[in-house]
């Protein structure tokens, strides 16, 4: 079996089950589970949105804002530019009225999976998604979003995929709203050895504390793997205290 990141999948699955006990820890899917879920998304346009969430860690509103111009797919280092909408919203809330022009926070996320990049190129070519389109009301040219849908539609797509998987005997032990892909991306990158500060930048977290929540899952793993023993034969303990050992 060829896994995208060399991890002990049974151990990772057991760790995830242990983490599920704590409500404050993120709910995430492992790479084989994401690939299996995508198998049950028949439409390429739908599948590539979910694959984009998985390959970039984007928030759903960030992904739905993407246009063709936000992607640079040329080798050797394809990437996507995401507007970090959560930080932008927070900044706007602190100022009177709208945020000043040019204040939008962006982040670059490398697209390191060649299969994803090739599928994205195929989708754009097949659906003939334009860069711009004239607004019929204003007459102005505007950038065209790749996925002109709402997050509610995405949730419906996911529900349909989960139902199709269940009908085929495949189930998932965590809920699968759009944000699950963001958590899954973060955990997948940590499994791949990406440093925490780098992950913070890729995720668009303003504070490192937001990123550190993912390392709490690995804290469970480290503690469990050490197999620390607390008990010794009671007779030996008594003898030790008496000075006989």
Residue ranges with predicted function:
Residues 1-28, 230-245:
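C-terminal secondary-structure termini that scaffold catalytic or DNA-interacting sites
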């Amino acid at each position: 079996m060829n896994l995208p990141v060399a991890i002990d999948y049974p151990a990772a699955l057991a760790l995830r089950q242990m983490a599920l006990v704590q409500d404050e820890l993120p709910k995430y899917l492992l790479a084989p589970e994401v690939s299996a879920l995508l198998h049950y998304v028949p439409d390429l346009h739908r599948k590539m949105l979910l694959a984009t969430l998985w390959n970039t860690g984007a928030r759903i509103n960030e992904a739905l804002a993407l246009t063709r111009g936000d992607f640079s797919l040329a080798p050797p280092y394809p990437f996507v530019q995401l507007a970090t909408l959560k930080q932008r919203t927070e900044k706007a809330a602190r100022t009177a009225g709208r945020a000043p022009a040019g204040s939008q926070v962006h982040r670059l996320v490398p697209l390191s999976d060649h299969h994803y990049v090739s599928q994205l190129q195929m989708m754009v070519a097949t659906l003939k998604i334009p860069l711009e389109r004239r607004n019929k009301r204003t007459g102005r040219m505007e950038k065209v979003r790749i996925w002109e849908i709402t997050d509610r539609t995405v949730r419906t797509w996911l529900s349909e995929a989960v139902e199709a998987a269940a009908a085929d005997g495949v189930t998932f032990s965590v809920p699968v709203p759009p944000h699950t892909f963001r958590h899954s991306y973060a955990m997948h990158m940590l499994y791949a050895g990406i440093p925490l500060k780098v992950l913070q930048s890729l995720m668009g977290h303003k504070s490192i504390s937001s990123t550190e929540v993912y390392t709490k899952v690995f804290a469970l793993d480290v503690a469990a793997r050490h197999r620390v023993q607390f008990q010794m034969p009671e007779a030996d303990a008594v003898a030790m205290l008496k000075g006989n050992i």
